[in-house]
């Protein structure tokens, strides 16, 4: 179960305390009330209402077609099914890129739907928007490394930060986003050694890895991936936690424990 008392909601303060005390943070994507309830029972700390629903729920080839209305609807569903986990919702493509004011308007809609934090993709160039939101009372989770909304610009789903220049850019991005007020940051498909350096360089912003090695402050996976419900080739960073389990509750509890004790991700899941 969770580090917290079963009936005690996970808050941003508690997440910061977990980071400070070296207790790993577990996050999974979630898109509906039934799974929200299941993930809560298994002790997941953070539910990410991810725009990955475009891939695993809608059958899209990318997250780009997902709309703000989709994210509001799925956030409302997740909120109805859970009471304890902290809820983070992705801002979809096009919902925050035009201006900080546009981001504020759309982030407010997501918080009204029940989200407790919004997540947006991008590095230093998004720092102004992050600061604008945080100064107006909207908690922000940043996302660097492989940013799926930029899949066409990046030339596909590739590991980021391999070159010296790219690594320096990611380090600079992380510091700029922390200084702008982001409280959490997802690092996706980043070499484990680089993710470790970035995490160590930050004063208080908690890092959540996906394909970013074991030294982040926490881990996240797409729910459908970690229970083996995915089409095509499995990504290197994915582990099927249903293997050897009799039900999904047991698989999710196993994921939470593996994140907590540091056995996931293992070397074979890292770059």
Swiss-Prot record:
Cofactor(s), names only, from the UniProt record? Mg(2+)
What residues does 3-methyl-2-oxobutanoate bind to? 51-52, 90, 119
User: In its UniProt record, which GO terms are filed under biological process?
Assistant: pantothenate biosynthetic process
Q: Which residues form the active site?
A: 188
Which Pfam family, just one, is annotated for this protein?
Answer: Pantoate_transf
The highest taxon in the source lineage is: Bacteria
Q: Which InterPro entries match?
A: Pantoate_hydroxy_MeTrfase (IPR003700), Pyrv/PenolPyrv_kinase-like_dom (IPR015813), Pyrv_kinase-like_dom_sf (IPR040442)
Which pathway? Cofactor biosynthesis; (R)-pantothenate biosynthesis; (R)-pantoate from 3-methyl-2-oxobutanoate: step 1/2
Which free-text remark accompanies the cofactor?
Binds 1 Mg(2+) ion per subunit.
- The secretion signal range is none
EC assignment:
2.1.2.11
Q: Name one GO cellular component term.
A: cytoplasm
Compartment(s) of residence: Cytoplasm
What keywords sit in the KW lines? Cytoplasm, Magnesium, Metal-binding, Pantothenate biosynthesis, Transferase
- One annotated GO molecular function: magnesium ion binding
Q: What HAMAP family does the database record attribute to this sequence?
A: PanB
User: Its biological function?
Assistant: Catalyzes the reversible reaction in which hydroxymethyl group from 5,10-methylenetetrahydrofolate is transferred onto alpha-ketoisovalerate to form ketopantoate.
Q: What is this protein called?
A: 3-methyl-2-oxobutanoate hydroxymethyltransferase
Natural source organism: Aromatoleum aromaticum (strain DSM 19018 / LMG 30748 / EbN1)
Gene giving rise to this polypeptide: panB
């Amino acid at each position: 179960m969770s580090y917290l008392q079963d009936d005690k909601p996970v808050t941003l303060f508690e997440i910061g305390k977990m980071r400070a005390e070296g207790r790993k943070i577990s996050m999974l994507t979630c898109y509906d009330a039934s799974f929200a309830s299941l993930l809560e029972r298994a002790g997941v700390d953070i539910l990410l209402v991810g725009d990955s629903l475009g891939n695993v729920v809608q059958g899209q080839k990318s997250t780009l077609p997902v709309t703000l209305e989709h994210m509001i609807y799925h956030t409302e569903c997740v909120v109805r099914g859970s009471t304890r986990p902290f809820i983070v919702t992705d801002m979809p493509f096009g919902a925050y890129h035009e201006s900080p004011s546009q981001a504020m308007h759309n982030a407010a809609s997501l918080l009204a739907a029940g989200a407790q934090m919004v997540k947006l993709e991008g590095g230093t160039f998004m720092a102004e928007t992050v600061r604008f939101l945080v100064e107006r009372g909207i908690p922000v989770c940043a996302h660097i490394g492989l940013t799926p909304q930029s899949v066409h610009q990046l030339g596909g789903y590739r590991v980021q930060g391999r070159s010296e220049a790219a690594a320096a850019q990611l380090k600079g991005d992380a510091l700029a986003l922390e200084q702008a007020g982001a409280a959490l940051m997802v690092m996706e498909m980043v070499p484990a050694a680089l993710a470790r350096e970035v995490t160590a360089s930050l004063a208080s912003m908690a890092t959540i890895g996906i394909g970013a090695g074991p030294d982040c402050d926490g881990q996240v996976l797409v729910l459908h991936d970690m229970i083996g419900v995915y089409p095509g080739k499995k990504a290197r960073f994915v582990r099927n936690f249903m293997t050897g389990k009799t039900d999904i509750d047991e698989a999710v509890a196993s994921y939470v424990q593996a994140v907590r004790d540091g056995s996931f991700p293992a070397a074979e899941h890292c770059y």
